[in-house]
Amino acid sequence: MGIHGLTKLIADKAPGAIKEHKMDSYFGRKIAVDASMSIYQFLIAVRQGEQGQLTNEAGEVTSHITGMLYRTIRMMEAGIKPAFVFDGKAPTLKGGELAKRKERKAVAEAELTRLQESGEGTAEDIERQQKRLVRASREQSEDVKKLLTLMGVPVVDAPCEAEATCAKLAEAGLVFGTGTEDADALTFGTPKLIKNLNASEAQKKPIVEIDLARALEGLELTMAQFVDLCILMGCDYSDTIKGIGPVKGLELIKKHMNMEGVLAEVKKMGPKYEIPEAFPYEQARALFVTPEVVDCSTVDLKWTEPDAAGLLQYLVHEKQFDEARVKKAIERLQKCKGKNSQNRLESFFGPVTVRASEKKAVAAACRESCPDSAAASSCHSSLVALALLRTHALGPGPLCALGRSLPRSGAGQRRPG
């Protein structure tokens, strides 16, 4: 479920925290992906028309395997190094949310039966109810783990919530950010939230990146206040306070500094604002601030050669996939290996933030000394040139020599960074 309305609130109040990118902008990036969320998305999205989810001849659902195979290859073709993190046990405090999901599933089942028996429902109505019934099973998670291992992609088993472990891997510097649609990864502390990684090419959705530090700056909150705001807005661990939405919640947190101050004020505000009888905000806060996660010092993320024979055996002989298609997928996967062995230049020079004054200075120096405009452009746009300029105080001559040695635009080469 995530946090009710959080992405919209950040977009409205801290728009500088949200950027849109193409997938290949993450070339060389390691991203921790919420596997459980991905499986759920594939079970819903990968379908065969009115017949529902993809199945093999034995009637086994294969939507999750098909989706994970091709979306992961697509990420790797863009140079991304995905590491998939799987949910462990659900926190006890999440029991209320899980019970609500069970109730919603029962309602959807009853409505689907009614539509099918009465003949009143359109194909769209029936598909909508079918999607509401989708739940990822433990067996489907094991299917995907086996697939990813054969693909040479690292798998991490979280002791509890996958988003929490993803966030801690990012905080520890083992990955760049968290790939999920659930905004509560920000509440768990991921520096970067990356959305739409699993969107199909046909949807043409850009990758949406939310920067936590910029969100906090734009919202004018500390991390502790941000966590309290997320609980106030509604999360998996507690209900909301009637009458308080995202904007009102932000206003109250900024005015009263924390949840305790907000609750004291709400009690004076009259019957319009109703605090739930059970509102375990302290326990919810603890789950966000000190979640149960893997010990990052023991995590060793490695991307290895795909096991072509193992993939053929698993997908073709065990899961009854088309052999020709599987062989083509393996060829694509093998071609990704070269890309995924490359690193971003900042892994050598450190992260580079380009200051406007530096950008102008480098560009001016290159234009002055480079008669070749293409070389000058390559020179001043290069992170290498900027890093060398800072580190060694190079003049325009060495910079332009470097610029001429770099690939020209239009030559089919990837720009550094």
Describe each model-derived feature in a short phrase.
Residues 1-106, 113:
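Non-catalytic, usually N-terminal nucleic-acid engagement modules in DNA/RNA processing proteins
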Residues 4, 55, 96-299:
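Extended two-metal-dependent nuclease catalytic cores across DNA- and RNA-processing enzymes
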Residues 13-27, 209-372, 378:
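Non-catalytic nucleic-acid-binding/docking modules located in mid-to-C-terminal regions
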Residues 43, 67-69, 73-77, 145, ...:
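Amphipathic alpha-helical interaction motifs in eukaryotic regulatory proteins
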Residues 369, 373, 377-382, 405, ...:
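Serine residues within intrinsically disordered or low-complexity segments
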Residues 385-409:
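GST-like fold's C-terminal all-alpha helical module
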